[in-house]
Amino acid sequence: MIPGELRVNDDLGQIELNVGRTTQTLSVANYGDRPIQVGSHYHFYEVNEALHFDREATKGFRLNIPAGMAIRFEPGQRRTIELVEFAGKREIYGFQAAIMGNVDKHITTTIPDDKEVK
């Protein structure tokens, strides 16, 4: 064995993430002048306002990528991403404090409206 090597039992098949959870695909554009990086568990509804997309549709969703990973949006870049719904109690605290409690029941504070993304 080589130091740091991982040996995986191929008979077990592929590991599937977020099986059975609601997902959505979304087009996102960075209208800002700096790169923006979003981590795997960041509440997508509350990301940097320079990212333009259907923000209301992302309430209660995060990136559908492995834990600890991130996606970087370069200035002027548009990319298609996949989001996955938060599970468990669906309580969201922190970030920009737009949701402070259960995402299904909470009334959000004001986040600047996005320009229509073309």
Curated annotation (Swiss-Prot):
Keyword Cytoplasm: yes
Cysteines engaged in disulfide bonds, as pairs: none
Record GO cellular component, one term: urease complex
Biological processes per GO annotation: urea catabolic process
Compartments where located: Cytoplasm
Presence of the UniProt keyword Hydrolase in the record: yes
Classification via NCBIfam families: PRK13203.1, urease_beta
Protein name: Urease subunit beta
Protein species of origin: Aliivibrio fischeri (strain ATCC 700601 / ES114) (Vibrio fischeri)
UniProt gene name: ureB
